[in-house]
Structures are given as C-alpha cells and as structure tokens.
Amino acid sequence: AGKKRPWKCCDEAVCTRSIPPICTCMDEVFECPKTCKSCGPMGDPSRRICQDQYVGDPGPICRPWECCDKAICTRSNPPTCRCVDEVKKCAPTCKTCLPSRSRPSRRVCIDSYFGPVPPRCTPR
C-alpha cells in the first residue's frame, strides 16, 4: 500500500476494518490519475480502475453533492446523474451552483456526475 493517496477523491472506497484502514477506490474512470501505479481494465473496455491500495482515510467524495433525493440518471452502467434537489447551500464539490427557478432563495447544483446513483438525503 502506498504512502500517498493515489486519487484526489473517491465515491466507492472499499476499506478494511483495520486501524488505520487499507483502502482501494473502486470508482470507474476513463483515465487513471498519474499518481496511480496500477491502472486496470473494467468490464467496459473504455473504463479503468486504479487498483492501488492506500493506508488511511480514503479522502473526500468526488460527486458534486453528498446525497440526493431527486436524482435524474441515465440507464448506462454506471450512470451519469444530475441532482435537482433545491438546497440552502450547494456542497463544496459543486462547480456550478445556481438559484432555483421556482424558489430563488434555494440553490441547485447543475453539475453532472458519472458514477453510482447517489444515496438519498432523507429516508423513505
């Protein structure tokens, strides 16, 4: 396992329960970061995954929101998603945060994200 985390962010971290944890980021990407030593193929030939392990915190999430109740996603696997939730403040990972059309005091992150459907913010 490397001393420096080979990814900037990770949405699908798989970590051991040890302290500190040993983590692998299972995010599917078109190109692995330059810091990744072992970049392997996925089922889809256009996607790759960094197979490096890192000892410690897997780092921040990549998607532009932490959770989403109203996700609009493509049917691809993994999907491309947008979140149309109206929030008080967009997540720090959101690049384009605009006022809601229906409620200007609320905000909507209009970024698209390629990866797993985000978790819900409120339980069903």
From Swiss-Prot:
Keyword Nucleotide-binding included in the entry's annotation: no
GO molecular-function term, one example from the UniProt record: serine-type endopeptidase inhibitor activity
Sequence repeats: 1-62, 63-124
UniProt cross-references to Pfam families, sorted A to Z: Bowman-Birk_leg (PF00228)
Marked site: Reactive bond: R17, S18, R75, S76
Keyword Disulfide bond on entry: yes
Intrachain disulfide bonds: C9-C62, C10-C25, C15-C23, C32-C39, C36-C50, C67-C121, C68-C83, C73-C81, C90-C97, C94-C109
Keywords (A to Z) from UniProt: Calcium, Disulfide bond, Protease inhibitor, Repeat, Serine protease inhibitor
Superkingdom of the source species: Eukaryota
Cellular component GO terms held in the UniProt record: extracellular region
InterPro entries xref list: Bowman-Birk_prot_inh, Prot_inh_BBI
CDD domains recorded: BBI
Family: Belongs to the Bowman-Birk serine protease inhibitor family.
Role played: This inhibitor interacts with two molecules of trypsin.
Matching PANTHER family: BOWMAN-BIRK SERINE PROTEASE INHIBITORS FAMILY DOMAIN-CONTAINING PROTEIN, BOWMAN-BIRK TYPE BRAN TRYPSIN INHIBITOR
Name of the featured protein: Bowman-Birk type trypsin inhibitor
Gene encoding the protein: BBBI
